[in-house]
Amino acid sequence: MALFSKQNKEVFTNPLNLDHPILGQVLGICSALAVTAQLKPAIVMGLAVTVITAFANVIISVIRNTIPNRIRIVVQLVVVAALVTIVSQILKAFAYDVSVQLSVYVGLIITNCILMGRLEAFAMMNKPWPSFLDGVGNGLGYAMILVIVGAAREFFGRGSLLGFQILPQGFYNLGYVNNGMMTMPAMALILVGCVIWVHRAYFYKEK
């Protein structure tokens, strides 16, 4: 099968639209709500999940025929835990402030429903390259929602993006006030719900 055959393209693109892990399958909601108060940690978390999902898929796909069925979940968890540890150490070394913001949520990637679901449903049944594409697609789909929600919450809640002030002081002089509710966890849930609503209204409008 060609590297970029029609089937492989669908494997990559499906998680970005109709079969989106958060919008379509409603997986990974907890971390999506927890790390989106600001855009920067949302981007880092999204990239971390993408990298870990992609490489965990590849590793499990390579060794899938040697894994005893009774311990396959344990093996998957060990592989993911090893990758999460590596990513966590890299973040602490090169982006310490972000790693502090993300706190325990990087470690909780180990139990992320999206990741474990792709390992069990796809990587265990497919070759390494399609598994890699599936991991990247699902990771990017997850990251996309984190970026949308994180950007909206930071912009309307703080008037900034990536820590840089976006709204000019003139707005505040005219009486504009940042929406403090956007910094509350409940708003993340509401925003994710709105995005899910728009997604389903678009893709399921014929039904």
Feature locations, PLM:
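Hydrophobic core segments of alpha-helical transmembrane domains in multi-pass membrane transport
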Residues: 29-33, 49-54, 81-88, 110-114, ...
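N-terminal membrane topogenic signal
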Residues: 12-23
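C-terminal transmembrane helix-loop-helix hairpin of multi-pass membrane proteins
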Residues: 10, 130-207
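Short amphipathic alpha-helical coupling elements at transmembrane boundaries
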Residues: 14, 61-65, 69, 130-138
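C-terminal ends of transmembrane helices
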Residues: 56-69, 116-126, 200
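Cytoplasmic-side transmembrane-helix entry/capping segments in multi-pass membrane proteins
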Residues: 67-80, 101-107, 134
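Transmembrane alpha-helix boundary signature
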Residues: 86-101
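Structural signature of hydrophobic alpha-helical transmembrane segments
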Residues: 39-55, 75, 99-110, 186
